[in-house]
Amino acid sequence: MLGVFVVVSAATGFLLTAMQRQAAVLQATALEAQHEALAEIMNDSIKSAVDFQIYQDAPMDASNGALAPGNSSGDWLVCVNQNGTTRFHFDGAQIECQQTGNGAVQTRVFPGASRASPNNGQPNSDEQPDNGQNSHQPIFNLSNLGIIQGQWNVNTAVDQVPFNVFGVPLQMQ
């Protein structure tokens, strides 16, 4: 009788562990899918932009509707197209996407984001490993060729997934 109890207990333990692992994989897959949707929104916003700016701090709204001068890199990206304005903001743990058009404002939050390391997490021989907390690496930057880049990592219970979005705004194509 004791043998049956041990076998049933072990089988139950294995089953619970497998279910926990499956739940972690499903949560990771859902989080990755959310960030894939964010990358698609960001890509569409960049490529259809008739005006854009990158900011290090929260942008001020100009009274004439034009975007205030920005920076070459920062944690804010504002894209204006014919349908409205899309703002992306990284706050250290999530990316917020706010879309404004025809007077309506839609805000979505994408949790689990962290800064991408400039060397894809692979330290040089004289560097300490980057754990995604590099506060000096903004997620948005503008190259000398006019290419906007958004780069971040998504940290799941299973792994860390890098996301990169590149695009040339409509006005520069």
Give the role of each language-model region.
Residues 143-156:
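A short hydrophobic beta-strand element
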